[in-house]
Design a protein with these regions (language model features):
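Active-site gating loop/helix substructures
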Residues: 162-254, 258-259, 264-283, 287-288, ...
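Alpha-helix termini
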Residues: 50-60, 154-159, 313-322
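Acidic, Ser/Thr-rich peripheral helices and adjacent loops at domain boundaries
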Residues: 270-310, 352-353
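C-terminal helical/tail subdomains of lipid-metabolizing enzymes
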Residues: 133, 310-412
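Active-site periphery "cap/insert" segments of enzyme catalytic domains
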Residues: 133-171, 178-182
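Small-residue-rich anion-binding loops in enzyme active sites
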Residues: 2-30, 174-194
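Flexible loop/turn segments at secondary-structure boundaries
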Residues: 36-38, 76-77, 241, 264-267, ...
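Patatin-like phospholipase
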Residues: 22-28, 36-140, 144-146, 183-195, ...
Length: 412
């Protein structure tokens, strides 16, 4: 059954896969990518934490045992893994992290003193950076931000304690074309899955993995990682991600909450976009970004629905002999246009970035989609988080019912 992002209650789906290796049911959290837009996830998860706190008390354990993230969603998943020992407070800390982030803490546009006064000089600097680094922006600031925010050693503590079972981060190899999932698990055993164009490898998650997973094509530089006995260069994990739910399923999740950041519709912008005629470079770039980041989750859930329908048509005696298990999936997507939000806040970007986006036509109409991935500024971040909180509150009963079996023991 297709997901309509405008529908207030997208359906739960079930995926059939091999039996879970874990004796206890596991709840997975899958976080999709989308640059600054993933602040929506922080707001939604904070609201979910508040829901659980009201029903089970603030001492409830961290609710998710399997975490999987892609691109900026991988940053969120890894941050949460490092805070899992703190229980529900970890969800609040993710929101606190996003509340204090700024564009300068994520990336900058390489500049010379002349670039500050000339749009042409800025354009030349952009081309120079693209030639040298195959990327428009310098993301070194994000390396420093992540090192300060994420205590990687605490991930292993959470795994060994049993609070977590697994963390997975995805990235796409420019060198081989393979979409890799890097897994850090409680037992540390090799992850035995390999599919055409998709592979997994057991590795402790590092900041380098996060930089690779979040390296938006053309925007941020690729990151080298050692994999399968050799060095390969990686970019954003959303590229070539055919099945974003598969890593959580392979790692044993029996139920999955998947939070995307896709654009429901551009109804508020469509009339002006038609009147504008030929799309700007910013509009085309935003459309390409949307294809990279947002189409795969919907397609994956649609595929699950088709598989479920086929399985439901089989006699019970046949299904009982299959080496498969049901996996319930609940999806959460923004109920309002993130492009429109970005258009309202784009003027708050640092001046050099603003100048570039203005030149691309990415600050008006449907071109604002591009700005929405790069707008790490307080007004936009706050609006995204508020939307995530409101969307959870609007579906509170449904979400609480879905999460109820995972409500566990108090934090030790």
């Amino acid at each position: 059954m297709p997901i309509d992002p405008l529908t207030p209650n997208p359906p739960m789906s079930r995926l059939s896969t091999r039996h879970s290796p874990h004796p206890q049911p596991l709840l997975g959290l899958v976080l999709m990518g989308g640059g600054a837009r993933t602040a929506y996830q922080a707001g939604a998860l904070q609201a979910i934490g508040q829901l659980l706190s009201r029903t089970s008390g603030p001492a409830q354990a961290f609710p998710f045992q399997v975490l999987a993230g892609t691109s900026a969603g991988a940053l969120n998943a890894t941050f949460l893994a490092s805070k899992a020992m703190e229980g529900l407070a970890g969800l609040d800390e993710l929101a606190h992290f996003w509340t204090h982030i700024r564009t300068e803490a994520v990336y900058r546009l390489p500049q010379t003193p002349l670039d500050k006064f000339s749009r042409w000089a800025t354009a030349v600097g952009l081309l120079r950076s693209a030639r040298v680094h195959a990327a428009a922006m310098d993301s070194l600031a994000l390396v420093n931000t992540l090192h300060q925010a994420i205590a990687l050693e605490k991930i292993d503590t959470a795994l060994q304690s049993g609070v977590l079972q697994a963390l997975a981060v995805t990235a796409s190899s420019y060198s081989s074309g393979i979409h890799w999932t890097f897994c850090q698990t409680r037992d540390g055993q090799p992850i035995p899955w390999s599919r055409p164009g998709r592979r997994a490898e057991q590795q402790p998650i590092t900041i380098e993995h996060l930089m690779a997973s979040s390296a938006i094509p053309f925007i941020f530089p690729s990151t080298p990682l050692w994999v399968d006995g050799g060095m390969e260069f990686f970019g954003d994990g959303s590229m070539r991600q055919i099945s974003p739910l598969s890593s959580a399923v392979h790692l044993g999740a029996d139920r999955i909450l998947a939070i995307g950041v896709s654009q429901p519709q551009r109804a508020s912008l469509s009339t002006s976009a038609r009147a504008a005629g030929r799309p700007s470079l910013g509009t085309i770039a935003g459309h390409a970004m949307a294809s990279v980041f947002h189409d795969t989750l919907e397609a994956d859930v649609e595929q699950l629905a088709r598989i479920n329908q086929a399985l439901d048509s089989l006699p019970e005696s046949v299904r009982a002999d299959l080496p498969l298990r049901p996996v319930r999936v609940l999806t959460l997507q923004p109920s309002a246009s993130l492009d429109a939000l970005a258009q309202a806040h784009a003027h708050t970007l640092p001046r050099p970035i603003l100048r570039v986006l203005e030149g691309l036509g990415a600050l008006r109409g449907s071109g604002a989609a591009l700005a929405s991935y790069l707008l790490f500024e307080p007004g936009f971040i706050s609006a995204l988080m508020a939307l995530g909180q409101a969307d959870v509150q609007a579906r509170a009963d449904e979400i609480q019912s879905f999460l109820a079996p995972a409500q566990a023991h108090p934090v030790r």
